[in-house]
Amino acid sequence: MGREIARVLGAGRKENGYMTGNGYMVTWTYGNMLSLAMPKDSGTAHVEWKDFPLLPPSFLTVRHVKTDTGWNPDINAVLQLKVIAKVLNACDTIIAATDASREGEMLFRHLYGFLGCKQPCLRLWISSLTDEAITEGMANLLPCDRFNNLFLAA
């Protein structure tokens, strides 16, 4: 999805994990790069019913994968999150172009919050990746706060 949008926007210069050009920086996620934090992520080794509700300081963490040494952060997710943070920090305004759905909105909002992003954001709301749909969507960007209820519904 990101590469198609980058092509239409004229951001054809390939970088490590993102594309640039024509005044845009376009990056992407793959799957859910964040997951819910487990009790051990906040230093709690053993949890009992009396401990609930258990609300860690941050309820999101980088997705973990099972390896020979146990559950460890997904290194590919860690690396791409660093790229996304770099791109977000370099921009004055963020254009959220995740899937036009509750889940897409939630994915963006979780990343935005997890990375501590403060820049204003606009929403590219398209249901097709045709050149025409992307061009029309870019001409009709909406403030992200118009989608607050969609995020809350997710």
Where are these regions (language model features)?
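Intrinsically disordered, low-complexity regulatory segments
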Residues: 1-154
